[in-house]
């Protein structure tokens, strides 16, 4: 008279990943680090776009900006971090900064080059006698 539940517990099969095509298996690559390996000590310092007013900088207390540097053409140490040894500007995809920051950085680097603060090309041994 009693109805008993005699169902067997089903095994849980792990779901397989579905790929759209066979080529996607071969083309998957691991992406490298966004920061260049030029420095032995650590990563690049993140730049900050200069505010139009100093009051804007003081109001934003919730953002941690103490470890960042403001983009300026006079700040050689910051600008040299975003330039290769050959003198080329490091692209945005390698540094991991935003498009707006890259634009400001490029303008600052070009201004510093014109004023003679940064070199246009690398210094070769045979060039300077």
Swiss-Prot record:
It is found in: Plastid, Chloroplast. Belongs to the bacterial ribosomal protein bS18 family. Keywords: Chloroplast, Plastid, Ribonucleoprotein, Ribosomal protein, RNA-binding, rRNA-binding. GO terms for cellular component: chloroplast; mitochondrial small ribosomal subunit. Its main location: plastid. Residues 1-20 are annotated as: Disordered. It comes from Stigeoclonium helveticum (Green alga). One of its GO terms (molecular function) is small ribosomal subunit rRNA binding. The gene is rps18. It comes from the Eukaryota. One of its GO terms (biological process) is translation. NCBIfam families: S18. PANTHER family: 30S RIBOSOMAL PROTEIN S18, SMALL RIBOSOMAL SUBUNIT PROTEIN BS18M. Transmembrane segments: none annotated. This is Small ribosomal subunit protein bS18c. Part of the 30S ribosomal subunit. Pfam families: Ribosomal_S18 (PF01084).
